[in-house]
Amino acid sequence: MNKGILCVVSGPAGVGKGSVCKDYLNRYENTFLSVSATTRQPRPGEEHGISYYFKTKEEFEEMIENDDLLEYARFCDNYYGTPKKDVQRSLDEGKDIILEIEVQGALKVKEIMPEAVLIFIFPPSFEELEKRLVGRNTETPEVIEKRLLRAKEELVISKQYDYIVVNDEIELASQKIHCIIDAEKQKVSRNKKLITEVTGQ
């Protein structure tokens, strides 16, 4: 059995990466969303082990100390991170994993696991990104301005990713990710065991 593909998805706020990932998971089998660990309090409807692994600050810092995380970050006084063991076990079982994280975390994952596939979700235009952020009606103009400044930085960092997928239409963006993962599975570097089995060399 070939190992699964670790697909790391990032993109600026408002680009629709969460919607694209959700559509992908609903559409394609044998693909799972990596469950992150966090020290923040559970919100109504969230379940431990499904939405997040809810940890105390001490438990999370112990995970950092034991090198149990692929990546982690601190945001609004809470830790967020990706448990290494769960991801590795799923990949070894041949499952494909979608990891939706910000750019610094994605580049850290690539350092540790060079075989990971980094996909950056791009807006059709910067104007469209601004329109989507304003259309959410969830943030003040000041917050939107900060998010747009951050978005410009992230769009530049996307040059370090493996692929760019423009989210003009959610279903189409989801299909493009599927094509990328499918093509990655055909790479010679991922099929050396098959070559040896067939050729005996």
Say what each PLM segment does:
Residues 18:
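Walker A/P-loop
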Residues 138-139, 153-201:
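NTP-dependent small-molecule kinase module
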Residues 38-97, 104-107:
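ATP-dependent small-molecule kinase phosphotransfer cores
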Residues 97-102, 111-135, 166-167:
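Conserved phosphate-donor/acceptor-positioning beta-strand/loop module used by diverse small-molecule
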Residues 10-12:
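P-loop (Walker A) phosphate-binding loop of NTP-binding proteins
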Residues 25-34:
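Post-Walker A helix-loop "phosphate-sensing" segment adjacent to the P-loop in P-loop NTPases
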Residues 6-8:
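Short hydrophobic/aromatic beta-strand immediately N-terminal to the Walker A/P-loop
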